[in-house]
Amino acid sequence: MADASAGGLYQCLTDISRADTSGDYQKALTSANKLIRKYPKETFAFKCKLVAQIQLSQYADALELIRKTPAHQMGHVGFEKAYIHYRQDELDEAIKELNTCDKDDVKALELKAQVFYKQENYQQAYDIYLYLLKNHSDDSDELRRANFLAVQARLEAQGVKQAVAETEDSYSQLYNRACVEIEAEKLPQALESLEKALKTCRKSFEDEDREEDEIEEELDSIRVQKAYVLQRMGQKAEALAIYEKVQAANHPDSSVKATITNNIPAASSDFALPESRKRFKAALQIDQTKLTRRQRLTLMLNNALVLLLSNQREPCKRALEELVAKFGSSKDVALIEATLHFKMGDAEAALKVLAGSDLEQSLARLHVLLNAGRLPEAVGAIRDLPISGKLGASSLLTSTLIAADSRDEAVKELVAASTAKNQTPEALKSILEDLVEVEQQRGNETAATKHLEKLVEKFPEDLQLQCRLVGAYSKTDPKKAESLSAKLFPETMEVDVNVDELEDSDWILYGEKYRQKKEAKSPQTAEIAATRKLKIATKRKRKIRLPKNYNSAVTPDPERWLPRQERSTYKRKRKNREREIGRGTQGSSSANPNVEYVTASPNSPRPLPGPVAEGPRQQRPNFQKQKKKKNASKF
């Protein structure tokens, strides 16, 4: 054995072992290079160098080392090559390399399960983890169990029901269990699991003497998931507070950043579109390899939606094209694209995009037809809806038929709806009232009266309906109208009402508020009223004052109340006699004997064109303005 101080084999191996224990892989790489130079035939040295390069993320150098090193010196490196491809997001190449490994190699099986999970082949990942949990047990059982729960959460999201065992101990397992419960719509249970995960995470990290920053970073991931659950449960204010707190902490995890950016606009009722555009633009520049396919798709969809709401039409169009290129078309993409076309005034293009047969696209297509005024096509679209038998669809169809001036068809639809089974009383009342209105619009008072009779029969306590029936009878059968009116409003009613008190009450004229104010101003109890002396209200009689020159023998002038200028005995001054010419009622002429009317001579000049008449107006005398007196100078 060579001397240790001279950098012999023993010293190099010791340095590699220490570096691996301390996590100093740069030192391990240096020791491996030294070992290869001194002992080029040592197979173990090449493997150590390869592992050190992988740990230092020197993937290109690691692949170059595998390519240059002969297979008999390097040994089998299928797992290492697969891991490099996995970290470089070359998942298909990773699967090829893993297929060359031993079928019972636990490391290769776990890596294959992770690759399947990233490829979203969740059922294959589920089978591998289930096999490992049943047939292998080592120090990685806790991590294996957490990964298994993560796969179960994804399967639950795809609609594959999962049974979760109550064996979670670590915070990772509790967190992933909560994810399964979220996908199963068990939100209260998920919230409880996340609360346990927060406590367990802090305790386990404190037991390991981790720094507070590291603990908070891990807790923030759980808090964001908790905020999502609160948001789904309708507690948006609490969820928004958590999102903003985590966002202020500047979390380094790309998945957490993307989740916060995506969820804040949905949780906030008054979010600003310009600010949201900036956040989505920043979120799309995050390392996309660390996000799941579902997260990337949701992020790009919401980005396109925010651009659409901001009226950024060209950027929205480009965002949709990029989305379709990466993930293909979908129902949500079609809805956003159709809305964009409709906003740009191209209803035909919007209808071409909405070619799907699902309910959402059918309703969107109907919305476009109605807004474009294509009522006959809209009627056909309503009838093709899978929910055409529902009350809302029937009401919309009737309104559309009436707007299209097809009242006969509208009546048929309403009659069919009124005879349908399992109708609630409120729905039946609404349908019959619509029938009455349509029949009255058609001028068919007899049919309207029949429908009103049905309404009164179904709802005999509704006085308003009975009054409407009286009005209908007055047009078709006056005798029935009189009979029903006498029944509803008899001449003598045995009601305990004090008519005199009602007539003397002011609150009937001025409303209930006047009554309440009057009672509040003078609260009197029965005891005080009984002991107090009642004052008899006496009218104050004012003494009659007569004019000084009053003569009782002379009859008073009947025009004494008229203004002086309007009395028959009034004589105008000469200069004011011509003022009243042309005055009086609109359209009438006044004949004043003092005015001479002279016809214009044929040779008289043509008058200049006057202003255009603006219609009749109330005329007023033009009084001369009084001249302002000059102010005397002050000393």
Swiss-Prot record:
It is found in: Cytoplasm; Endoplasmic reticulum. Coiled coil: none annotated. One of its GO terms (biological process) is SRP-dependent cotranslational protein targeting to membrane. The keyword Chaperone does not apply. GO terms for cellular component: endoplasmic reticulum; signal recognition particle, endoplasmic reticulum targeting. Pfam families: SRP72, SRP_TPR_like. Residues 557-569 have a biased composition (Basic and acidic residues). Its main location: cytoplasm. GO terms for molecular function: 7S RNA binding. Residues 625-635 have a biased composition (Basic residues). TPR repeats lie at residues 7-42, 75-105, 106-139, 171-204, 220-253, 255-290, 436-469. Residues 539-635 are annotated as: Disordered. The keyword Cytoplasm applies. Heterodimer with srpa-68. Srpa-68-srpa-72 heterodimer formation is stabilized by the presence of 7SL RNA. Component of a signal recognition particle (SRP) complex that consists of a 7SL RNA molecule of 300 nucleotides and six protein subunits: srpa-72, srpa-68, SRP54, F37F2.2/SRP19, F25G6.8/SRP14 and ZK512.4/SRP9. Within the SRP complex, interacts (via N-terminus) with srpa-68 (via C-terminus). Belongs to the SRP72 family. Component of the signal recognition particle (SRP) complex, a ribonucleoprotein complex that mediates the cotranslational targeting of secretory and membrane proteins to the endoplasmic reticulum (ER). The SRP complex interacts with the signal sequence in nascent secretory and membrane proteins and directs them to the membrane of the ER. The SRP complex targets the ribosome-nascent chain complex to the SRP receptor (SR), which is anchored in the ER, where SR compaction and GTPase rearrangement drive cotranslational protein translocation into the ER. This is Signal recognition particle subunit SRP72. It comes from Caenorhabditis elegans.
